[in-house]
């Protein structure tokens, strides 16, 4: 890839890369329309963990063939949520193996009687391996958490005499192995003087709790039997016009017509097209800008697609509306450009994590987090260390929060994790990530891994292949991974478009010595930039802080130490910010749960907010910095105003 001049991925406008996906079928977000219905299955499910020694009792006794309550005692389990923190059973919190969920559903009669209707079961995520049965029939399997999967169950609900209720059974195994993402190992403790026979532990190589279960929504939705299966959109700018290139996939018939209309925010039609692919030109287009970068950020159009088809059962129609943000992304050797303007990431790393619900999706928590991001003046975050719920990305699109979209490639710490089976799975996961998230304007870069052992020769080949595969899937966005390796030893850095670095000076290194941060940070930046000539993001930095701990002069774990550490980092960042450093993402937005260890007191405490989303002292420091940066980088240059209520306790 050429350096020195902007590499504008949007220049691939007519190239519709969706067809490069190896997966069969699209993964459009289920929505209601004139032709589509949805029935959410959130709420209480029956739940049972298989505590048998071999964790196989559920399969041996075929729990899926009859109501789960007939197999033995069950619990009420809320969906979505992680199962770990719901009960008072300590065994369940750290359970490794198969758990079983079940829900009985009554379908609308028209879903079962109308043969024009296609009925689909969709699971938002199931960590990590899932098998699904409908009325005892093996319907679907999926490997990997954090991403949706679905199955057409029309043939199970529209054929023959139907039971009064539809019984959905889902078995989930959260075991991590050397070939899962994230990877892990199972260690058997064979010393029978210390451990019972068959005792084992799950070893993980990442610093967050391995929550599991049905952590996102489960739902049923319908489409016509001939339907819009997928839409791929890329955008560009030509002089003062916006370009929207689209490709539409249809399944169920070869005899159909397609109409595409682009509507502005006032629901006025600004462009029309027909056929499965085309380009819509929007004179004087309103571009999608990040939050605080423009007076009118996050402008969204709507691409309305109408399908009409002739089938053996008669004419059918299908309708789907896709939000579209017109924007470009480009990278030079020292800048990250959005719509041709230098963009500086001033934001956070996050986790999907909260009390009780674990990694379960929660609307109040989502809205609270976005209010805090806006109050903070943050314009970006990384989905550390896995793809977040689709609803999160939709909020980012609407609010202008830029996203580095990361796959679950975290914990790749051992040589045995870089094997061909893992590589194949990793590439497939990237296909699923791109398929799901490709149309979000907020997503400006893919991250294929966090802190892999990238000094290994095997890791170099592995990362090269995953990055190349991701670029082939989506030429419209840059690709990176997040490194904590030495600049001279990193085997994956030559293949990324942007260097992302994690470093914890005066915390994990030379802890307590705040006076060393500026020198060490400057050395880090200069070494990496001299070798690779690529823009750099400080993708992690921070300090563990127990809310309410105070000491002056600052000592580790106090709020004063976290503030002082951030101040020293900021001085170092400012020395390079106008040169080739293009972003800073604090670790972390909020405290989060981890496995128990001697260095973790009820989880990781590096958040600038507590797990309950209350601010530590550093939150106010970071807020002051981010609003200052926002006013320096805004286009056009008008003063940004703090987004908080007049009576906010944070003002």
Curated annotation (Swiss-Prot):
Give the positions annotated as glycosylation sites: 173, 190, 272, 420, 631
Pfam families xref list: Glyco_hydro_2, Glyco_hydro_2_C, Glyco_hydro_2_N
Recorded protein name is: Beta-glucuronidase
Source organism of the structure: Pongo abelii (Sumatran orangutan)
> Which Gene3D superfamilies does UniProt cross-reference here?
Galactose-binding domain-like (2.60.120.260), Glycosidases (3.20.20.80), Immunoglobulins (2.60.40.10)
Which PANTHER family did the record assign? BETA-GLUCURONIDASE
- Protein encoded by which gene: GUSB
Residues of the signal sequence?
A: 1-22
**GO BP of this protein:** carbohydrate metabolic process; glucuronoside catabolic process
Q: Which residues form the active site?
A: 451
Q: Which GO terms describe its molecular function?
A: beta-glucuronidase activity; carbohydrate binding; signaling receptor binding
